[in-house]
UniProtKB/Swiss-Prot annotation:
Reactions catalysed according to its record: Endonucleolytic cleavage to 5'-phosphooligonucleotide end-products
Residues noted as binding Zn(2+) 2 in the record, renumbered to the chain: 146, 180, 217, 262
Cofactors, names only: Zn(2+)
Sites where the protein binds Zn(2+) 1: 70, 110, 146
InterPro entries xref list: AP_endonuc_2, AP_endonuc_F2_Zn_BS, Xyl_isomerase-like_sf, Xyl_isomerase-like_TIM-brl
Binding-site list for Zn(2+) 3: 183, 230, 232
UniProt name for this protein: Probable endonuclease 4
Cofactor binding remark: Binds 3 Zn(2+) ions.
Name of a matching Pfam family: AP_endonuc_2
Gene: nfo
Enzyme Commission no: 3.1.21.2
Lineage: Bacteria, Pseudomonadati, Campylobacterota, Epsilonproteobacteria, Campylobacterales
Enzyme class: hydrolase
Function, as annotated: Endonuclease IV plays a role in DNA repair. It cleaves phosphodiester bonds at apurinic or apyrimidinic (AP) sites, generating a 3'-hydroxyl group and a 5'-terminal sugar phosphate.
Length: 281
């Protein structure tokens, strides 16, 4: 079995609790926030917290590369204003260092927003520059850009945006992408039928490249196709439907990366994980 499915679990009470929460739902991968995602700063990890996390992870059998930490929602590496961008950069740097302390090798983030104050190209260049600065100051952690639904002034919804960011990143060995199925669908890439799925992923491969795929968010969508609205749903009850998730579970291009549920009903995550594994031919 080369698929590693889990969910974005709570780290409330300490990051080490995320491991237990992942195990409770039968996950082989998980995502977490390493700090409160709605605050700029957090107290530093003490050595006890780090040790407890690493010990719990080792006991769980979940590999560090199948853990996909997510950064704070406040961070905007493409911010049009320098002061605000620097504040985001400092917070992002701290998040990367937190991952490093926990022995994790990737950090998932939303690329950024132009806030209708600068052009898309300027915003994308800001994101790449911010990434370069963080990569210079850190080691061992890859920066994983998430595709977005394109809601508001958020960039990253087009594969070309992701490619443009990567193009200007100097150390391409430490950059990756995370594709969210809900965002992909809402951004206008159809994945509902075998033909549409193959076409959309073919575009992804041509424009970005599968070598950069370091994680996925597995979500159905409440919003209609191409609506640019980001509303997740439980698997099979949204606009995408179950076939897409069958395709993914049998697509070897998605092997050995964290496949993370962010579906809206956490009480059925264990069932959704079992469902996904039942799709494997």
């Amino acid at each position: 079995m080369s698929k590693f499915v889990g969910a974005h679990v709570s780290a409330s009470g300490g990051v080490f609790n995320a491991v237990e929460n992942a195990q409770k739902i039968g996950a082989k991968a998980f995502a977490l926030f390493t700090k409160n995602q709605r605050q700029w700063s957090a107290k530093e990890f003490d050595s006890e917290t780090i040790d407890k996390f690493k010990t719990a992870l080792e006991k769980s059998g979940i590999l560090p590369r199948h853990v996909l930490p997510h950064d704070s929602y406040l961070i905007n590496l493409g911010h049009p204003e320098l002061d605000a961008r620097e504040k985001s950069l400092d917070a992002f740097l701290d998040e990367v260092q937190r991952c490093s302390l926990l022995g994790l090798d990737r950090l998932n983030f939303h690329p950024g927003s132009h806030l209708k104050k600068i052009s898309e190209d300027e915003c994308l260049a800001n994101i790449s520059e911010s990434m370069n600065r963080v990569l210079d100051k850190t080691s061992g952690v890859s920066l994983v850009i998430e595709n977005t639904a394109g809601q508001g002034s958020n960039l990253g919804w087009k594969f070309e945006h992701l490619a443009q960011i990567i193009d200007k990143v100097e150390d391409k060995s430490r950059v990756g992408v995370c594709i969210d199925t809900c965002h992909m669908f809402s951004a206008g890439y159809d994945i509902r039928t075998r033909e549409a799925y193959d076409k959309s992923w073919g575009e992804f491969d041509k424009i970005v490249g599968f070598k950069y795929l370091m994680g996925m968010h597995i979500n159905d969508s409440k919003a209609k196709f191409g609506s640019h609205v980001d509303r997740h749903n439980s698997l099979g009850v949204g606009e995408i439907g179950l076939d897409t998730f069958k395709f993914i579970m049998n697509d070897e291009r998605m092997d050995d990366i964290p496949l993370i549920l962010e579906t809206i009903d956490d009480s059925i995550w264990a069932q959704e994980i079992r469902l996904l594994y039942s799709f494997v031919n």
